[in-house]
Each structure stands twice: as C-alpha cells, then as structure tokens.
Amino acid sequence: MRKLIYIIVGIAGILGALSRYYLGLTIHEFWHHTFPLATLLINLVGCFLLAWLTTYIAQRNILPAEIITGIGTGFIGSFTTFSTFSVETIQLINHSEWSIAFLYVSCSILGGLIMSGLGYTLGDFLIKKHLTEGDHL
C-alpha cells in the first residue's frame, strides 16, 4: 500500500504540472502585459482548492486518504508554484518594475490568504450543512 501512495502522488503531480503548463499558455494567449497574471491566477486557484480539499473532502471521508494525498500533494502541489512566483518577482525587480513587483507580491500573499479563507469557509459551510441534514462525517 505504501508504494501505491507514491504512484498516486506521482501521477497526480504529472497531471498538476501539465494543467499548470496548459493553463499558463492559455492565459498568455490573452494577457500580453508585464504583470505575471498566469502564475497569480494558478496559485490563487490552488490556495482555494487545497483549503477546500483539506476542510471538506478530507473530513467527510469522501475519498480514500491516498487519493486525497495525491490530489493535495501531487496535483495541487505541482499545479501551484512558489518558485515561479519568486523568480518572476526578482525579474520584475531587476527590470526596475517596482510597482508591478509590489502589486504582484501583495496580490499573491493577500489573495492567497483570501482564497484559502474562502476555500476553508466553503468547506466548513458544506460540512455544517451535511451535519444539519443528518449526514455523518
């Protein structure tokens, strides 16, 4: 069973990385500005999904723990990218794009916290809804 978790995380990681790459290319087709919108949007979606997953899906035992780990660590872990965020910020600073770099860092941190909060709130709301309907966690 221990080997299975590595396979699940690996496959989910491949799918997350491919999803990030495809979504990044798609956003770049429509966004031709200095601000790194693709990475920001991908990371914000990832913050929401991880918070929702760990709050709702994991507590409801809807999926086996191995699948939840695969989605959280594998898919969402490879879908989001702190390293790209960091490199893009340094590139903006090196090109003297100070205001864009500040906006990017601010939106990433505050937006990530807000999206995580929304994901948690949605998960918590859905759990309470199921409990009031008589369902069990």
UniProtKB/Swiss-Prot annotation:
Q: Which positions form S-S bridges?
A: none
Subcellular location per UniProt equals: Cell membrane
In terms of Pfam families, this protein maps to: CRCB
Give the UniProt keywords, A-Z. Cell membrane, Ion channel, Ion transport, Membrane, Metal-binding, Sodium, Transmembrane, Transmembrane helix, Transport
Tagged with keyword Cell membrane: yes
| Regulation of activity | Na(+) is not transported, but it plays an essential structural role and its presence is essential for fluoride channel function.
| Superkingdom, taxonomy of origin | Bacteria
One GO cellular component assignment for this chain's record is: plasma membrane
UniProt catalytic activity:
fluoride(in) = fluoride(out)
Q: Metal-binding: present as a keyword of the record?
A: yes
Quote the record's binding site residues for Na(+). 77, 80
The molecular function terms in GO held by this entry are: fluoride channel activity; metal ion binding
| Any single GO BP term | cellular detoxification of fluoride
Which membrane topology term applies here?
A: Multi-pass membrane protein
Chief subcellular location:
membrane
Task: Spell out where the chain crosses the membrane.
Answer: 4-24, 37-57, 62-82, 100-120
- UniProt cross-references to InterPro entries, sorted A to Z: FluC
Q: Which family does it belong to?
A: Belongs to the fluoride channel Fluc/FEX (TC 1.A.43) family.
HAMAP family membership: FluC (MF_00454)
Q: What does this protein do?
A: Fluoride-specific ion channel. Important for reducing fluoride concentration in the cell, thus reducing its toxicity.
Record protein name field: Fluoride-specific ion channel FluC 1
Lineage, highest ranks first: Bacteria, Bacillati, Bacillota, Bacilli, Bacillales
